[in-house]
């Protein structure tokens, strides 16, 4: 008889304990929701790196282009990479946390200016500008890959290097656009 009472009490205490611990566990999970945000930012970073790699591949091919029409792929890759990076900047907390990439606007304008007159052969100085842009962008891409730490934070030293290289490339393209 006393074993039966002890068993009922144990079951009752087990149910009460379960009813107390289960909501506490749910509350803990809800409050530590930050992990998913980190995961989303890290996934967005991976997409952005992929878009930057696509742009790098098209910039590698750009100096071999014969005509302005061949630069359409560069223009598309620029748009995609720029769009993705802008979203990453917003997700990372704004331009105070992650630098924007102004060279993309200047490169896009440079390509559009070349294509303005329709399809034509590229001039030697335009090909040289594409080669120099490719070389400078390769350095930027190497930095960009290391921009986010494994915990989802922006690495400030890499961000500073990226900002410097972006400024140099933007100034170079601005100068070429004025010639």
Locate each region found by the language model.
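A ubiquitous short alpha-helical element
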Residues: 39-46, 94-100, 129
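Hydrophobic membrane-insertion alpha-helices, especially the h-region
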Residues: 8-28
């Amino acid at each position: 008889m006393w074993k039966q009472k002890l068993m009922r009490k144990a079951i009752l205490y087990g149910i009460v304990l379960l009813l107390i611990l289960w909501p506490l566990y749910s509350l803990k999970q809800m409050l530590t929701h930050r992990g998913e945000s980190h995961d989303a930012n890290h996934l967005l970073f991976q997409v952005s790196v992929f878009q930057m790699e696509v742009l790098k591949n098209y910039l590698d091919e750009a100096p071999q282009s014969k005509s302005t029409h061949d630069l359409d792929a560069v223009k598309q890759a620029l748009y995609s990479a720029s769009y993705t990076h802008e979203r990453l900047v917003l997700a990372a907390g704004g331009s105070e946390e992650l630098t924007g990439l102004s060279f993309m606007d200047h490169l896009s304008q440079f390509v559009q200016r070349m294509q303005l007159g329709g399809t034509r052969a590229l001039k030697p100085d335009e090909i040289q500008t594409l080669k120099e842009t490719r070389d400078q962008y390769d350095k930027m891409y190497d930095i960009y890959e290391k921009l986010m730490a494994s915990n989802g934070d922006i690495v400030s030293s890499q961000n500073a290097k990226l900002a410097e290289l972006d400024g140099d490339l933007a100034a170079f393209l601005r100068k070429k656009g004025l010639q």
